[in-house]
Amino acid sequence: MSRAIMLAAAAATDLDPAPISPDWILSGTPETRSKELARSHDRTSYVMVWECTAGRFNWHYNKDETLVVISGAAVLTYEKGGERRIGPGDIVFFPAGTTCAWHVPEYIRKVAFLRHTMPYPFGFAVLAWNKLLRIVGWWATSPLLLALFLRH
């Protein structure tokens, strides 16, 4: 199966309307748009560009999200208190299951890296499986080790 490398200009990507749930809006009329740029082969991770106009809203994260601000700014208020202004170049990580209040004074555009989480035992099993495949793959490329392995 062929896998392609994806390149995009996040600042210039055309986006599609992606409204915020009306229940999440605290004030203003924020308009959001987004576009998925790429998705992993196993469908558990993807990259998207997202932008929002002025407003205040809560965002409930149902998957892990890491974002990089491309342009504009926002003020984030965390569930446990604390407030932080973010702007171009800032990186933020939101674990699945958290909520954050956003105040976008004018506009913000970000690139988001989203990942569906899985229970620890499943994640550990996937890591172990991948390691086993790497070991077997390494053996398969070494004629000496392959011969020794097949001999027994």
Annotate each PLM feature:
Residues 59, 76, 110-113:
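Short hydrophobic/aromatic-rich beta-strand segments that constitute the beta-sheet cores
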